[in-house]
């Protein structure tokens, strides 16, 4: 195959009639008795037809007539992903976490809008990445496109949807709230990020999304782990994308891809993965190992609001601290103690002056942690400052059948050594929960390529050294550091850490800044 004058594609095939009878702007230019040479006018429509005929390597027209706007140049794998999306009205993107698939989708959306193929786009994603991933990436890539975030009250959501912005971002649980408004709007492209959130077709969430997808709707589903726990996880995704491809019910589908071992135990059939692979097409996937042009370490922010219980206690504490702020005798030590209390609330448990522990509902943060773990193809390190929270997380993750270990100040040196050795050498995907100070120096843990900060530290040295446990000699994959934040003190600290200021900043000044908003 070759491109001629940026206008036509030359293809060699044993069956030229398959092309010339379907594509009007094509002609047979040579036939040697076995193989024909066909010239095809290079347009978006002909590319899609050729892909459907099996010529999947035919490049998208985005390659010849798009300027790739934005503040940075796309990586090769991002260009390939954008090309793929533009060429496929219904498609899956299975690129691994940290490979920049949101930017690739943004460019594809913009290109289709410039061609007047897509009128408006609806991005459906978790609340935690509405701003930190989608809004930020859209601003960096297609800043000329008006973007609105449909979040807040029902009226606020409706106002954004009914406005004239090109791209609307909404979280999964917000869809049902304004479903009628969304249905009446003219979205003809729907992008579902972290699509495993709609893997069950019996949920209200799936049913709401399904009402937005019409036969002529462009639909792109994005996830790094399409069937992480079970082949059945693919059912809801495929039914939304191509309902004709799957059984009528999830139970029938389960029977097709799994077999029953005992009353409560099912196992995948030998051919299940191959069957799922055939169903979930067309698809594209890049792992971080394949993306040779990626930076060695990537930073992400996941915004996870505090639960109502946490927010109430956090606000009460902050108000009390604000009252004492006028006291000139307050010191950096007092500030550090108070700031630590706020961090404890956000983390899920507060230590009282008598040593007791008050637990808080931190369900949303835990769900986000599970999402991140599911997205990662390798083991994961989770840094958490508080011992009680580590114990809570270990119990919850173990209950979800993850292989989990923990290291904190109460773990002996010999036991730590055994845990680190097992983590490095087992070859299994594991979760290691660590107090940052317990493994911030001299330990190699590059069996992981994802680090999660459940809550921030106040020391840049600790932050940098802890991240270096994964990003060090011997690491063969690009690494991702995910900062989870849900309150003012966390946002301020992460910003200071990323600006490498926390070893020098005025702790008292930062504390005052946090309380004053």
Predicted feature locations:
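Conserved helicase motor
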Residues: 128, 148-157, 172-177, 199-203, ...
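Conserved helix-turn-beta segment of the N-terminal RecA-like "Helicase ATP-binding" lobe
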Residues: 130-153, 241-244
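SF2 helicase motor core recognition
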Residues: 175-180, 229-231, 390-394, 416-420, ...
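Conserved P-loop NTPase motor "coupling/switch" region that bridges the ATPase
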Residues: 120, 147, 163, 189, ...
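Accessory DNA-engaging acidic/polar modules
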Residues: 1-72
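A conserved SF2-helicase RecA2
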Residues: 458-517
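Conserved pre-motif I regulatory segment
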Residues: 61-94
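Conserved Helicase C-terminal RecA-like lobe
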Residues: 96-99, 104-117, 122-125, 294-318, ...
């Amino acid at each position: 195959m070759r491109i001629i004058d940026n206008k036509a594609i030359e293809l060699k095939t044993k069956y030229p009639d398959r092309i010339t009878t379907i594509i009007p702007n094509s002609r047979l230019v040579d036939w040697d008795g076995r193989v024909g040479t066909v010239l095809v006018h290079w347009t978006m429509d002909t590319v899609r037809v050729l892909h459907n005929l099996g010529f999947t390597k035919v490049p998208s027209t985005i390659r010849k007539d798009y300027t790739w706007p934005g503040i940075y140049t796309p990586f090769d794998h991002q260009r390939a992903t954008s090309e793929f999306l533009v060429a496929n009205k219904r498609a899956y993107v299975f690129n691994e976490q940290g490979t920049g698939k949101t930017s690739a989708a943004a460019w594809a959306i913009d290109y289709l809008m410039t061609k007047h193929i897509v009128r408006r786009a609806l991005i459906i994603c978790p609340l935690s990445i509405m701003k930190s991933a989608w809004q930020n990436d859209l601003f960096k890539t297609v800043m000329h496109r008006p973007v609105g975030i449909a979040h807040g009250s029902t009226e606020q959501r409706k106002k954004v949807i009914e406005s004239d912005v090109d791209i609307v971002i909404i979280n999964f649980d917000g869809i049902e709230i304004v479903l009628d408004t969304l249905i009446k709007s003219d979205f003809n492209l729907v992008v579902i990020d972290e699509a495993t959130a709609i893997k069950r077709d019996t949920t209200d969430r799936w049913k709401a999304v399904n009402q937005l997808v019409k036969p002529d709707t462009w639909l792109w589903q994005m996830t790094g782990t399409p069937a992480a726990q079970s082949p059945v996880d693919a059912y809801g995704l495929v039914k939304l994308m191509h309902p004709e491809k799957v059984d009528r019910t999830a139970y029938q589908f389960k029977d097709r891809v799994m077999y029953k071992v005992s009353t409560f135990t099912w196992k995948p059939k030998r051919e299940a993965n191959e069957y799922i692979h055939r169903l979930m097409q067309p698809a594209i996937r890049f792992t971080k190992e394949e993306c040779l042009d990626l930076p060695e370490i990537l930073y992400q922010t996941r915004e996870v609001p505090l639960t109502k219980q946490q927010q109430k206690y956090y606000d009460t504490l902050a108000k009390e601290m604000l009252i004492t702020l006028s006291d000139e005798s307050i010191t950096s030590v007092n500030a550090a103690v108070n700031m630590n209390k706020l961090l404890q609330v956000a983390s899920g448990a507060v230590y009282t002056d008598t040593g007791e522990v008050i637990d808080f509902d931190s369900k949303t943060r835990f769900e986000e942690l599970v999402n991140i773990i599911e997205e990662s193809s390798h083991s994961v390190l989770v840094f958490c400052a508080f011992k009680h929270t580590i114990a809570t997380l270990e119990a919850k993750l173990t209950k979800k059948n993850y292989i989990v270990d923990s290291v904190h100040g109460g773990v002996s040196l010999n036991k730590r050594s055994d845990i680190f050795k097992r983590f490095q050498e087992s070859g299994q995907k594991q979760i290691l929960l660590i107090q940052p100070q317990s493994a911030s120096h001299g330990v190699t843990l590059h069996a992981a390529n994802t680090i999660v900060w459940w809550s921030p530290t106040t020391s840049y040295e600790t932050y940098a050294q802890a991240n270096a446990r994964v990003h060090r000699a011997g690491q063969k994959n690009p690494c991702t550091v995910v900062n989870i934040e849900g309150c003012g003190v966390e946002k301020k600290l992460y910003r200071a850490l990323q600006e490498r200021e926390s070893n020098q900043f005025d702790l008292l000044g930062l504390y005052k800044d946090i309380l004053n908003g």
